Amino acid sequence: MGQINRKFSEKQFLLFVVNYIAGFGFIATAISLFRLGPFSWLIFLLVSLVSLIVTLSFARLSSIDSQNYGGPYLWAKKAVDKEKIAGRMFSFFTGWNNFIIGPLSAATAPLFILNSFSGIDGIRGNLVNTWILIAIGFSFYVLLAFISTKGTSLNKKLIALFASVKWIVILSALIVAIYVIARDGNGYSQNNNLESGFFGRREISFAQIATVFITFFYSYAGVEDISVMTPDVKTNNFRKILIVSFIAVFLFYFIGIIILNGLQNIAQRGGEANSIGNVADIFKKAAGLGTLIFYGVGALFNNVSTRLSTIIANSRKILPLAYDNYLPSFFYKQNKKGEFQNAIWFTFGTTLIAMTLLVFIPLVASNFDFDNATEYAASVGSAATLLQYIFVFFIIFKFIYKKEPLYQKKWVKTTEELLFCLGTIVIVLMLLVYLFPVIDGFSKWETKHTLTIVLYGVLSLIGLVLFLLQEYKHKNKQNANKQTTQTTV
């Protein structure tokens, strides 16, 4: 192997990680917390705790192989027995699930932007104008996805520019929220009182808690992508970077939640003048159309930068699977320009199908409730991400069982083992109730629950079929070689 070109210093990568994780995921899902009233703090702290546990697991596993790309898929290959089909299948699905997180998260960005503009007078409540907005927004994102298949890249100055716009908009949202609180009075008492106000009359089910947990977890997602970049960092302590970045993100979110919790009528849907169902409503409430457009354009401007590279980046996740013969070699064939065009078009196709279903079906089923549809889209991608974390917990338990030298101090090992067990239990419980909400005995089965299971099931089935076809080809090749050897002898 040639010498690795490490692109980031420790400080640069720390800033990169914080910028990568913290952002529009937070403002897209933060309002969902307050649908639980005073329990919003409990869920915020629980999500943060599980995110910390996940960060600790990735930080621990990052020492397994800091010289090669791959992240969870690379760790899975080292943890299981490749000679057994169960081991190969686990390795494959660890990599495949990491790939399908992309398509399952594809609808969040367009719905988030559509939601930002849906509050403009003349759109909300007008079916024709609503469909025009949806058509324009959806077509725009399809175009961005198509452009990204051409290998469009952004230089460091443009990335810094887009990041600056993102933080200007996010910090503006918090500043505007403080202004609205100062002008209209704070809602801390209203939002945190179990016996009075909006929440005193609400019945909160376990399914609602699980849905909010998974939706808000979207704001912490990203460590699974960061973990594959260990060879790019000039550091001997990748673990410290991940933990410090988590602390920075947590503190920012904590301050943001404190501010948003002071808004009156937060997490109230319906489009009334005094209701706040999303962050765009805060801007609209502050100064009307002008600030709303500022927010929408700023959010769109930042979003374009990420979408221009999303197809290319996600297509890279299936290349190791193809190189290891878990997927057809068709995927890693390059064109004359050196691009993996087949993998890119496959990623584009799966992304387009998932995005179409996750945009239109939730909107129509909810009677064009953009807040609900956006939070649902975020929860679908987040659920797939949480499943990936279960795979990672299994991998680290496997390494511990094999007595790999992951720990130097026994008390650290014992503490982290207990935390990993806790994280696994919480995630499994939340996923079960989210996917099958009727478990709690109060919630009803809805169209979106069927869509979640069917879409994830179909994408997983596609992977399983491709995997089994490769297994069949490999077995036939082995038998043919065996027969040739016997004939020669």
UniProtKB/Swiss-Prot annotation:
Transmembrane spans: 14-34, 36-56, 100-120, 127-147, 158-178, 203-223, 241-261, 286-306, 344-364, 380-400, 419-439, 449-469
Species for this entry: Mycoplasma genitalium (strain ATCC 33530 / DSM 19775 / NCTC 10195 / G37) (Mycoplasmoides genitalium)
Signal peptide: none
Any GO CC annotation of this UniProt entry: plasma membrane
MF (Gene Ontology): transmembrane transporter activity
UniProt record similarity statement: To M.genitalium MG226.
UniProt keyword annotations, A-Z: Cell membrane, Membrane, Transmembrane, Transmembrane helix
Keyword Transmembrane helix: yes
Taxonomy, superkingdom: Bacteria
Name listed for the protein in its UniProt record: Uncharacterized protein MG225
This protein's record includes keyword Cell inner membrane: no
Topology of this chain in the membrane: Multi-pass membrane protein
InterPro entries referenced in this protein's UniProt entry, alphabetically: AA/rel_permease1, APC_superfamily
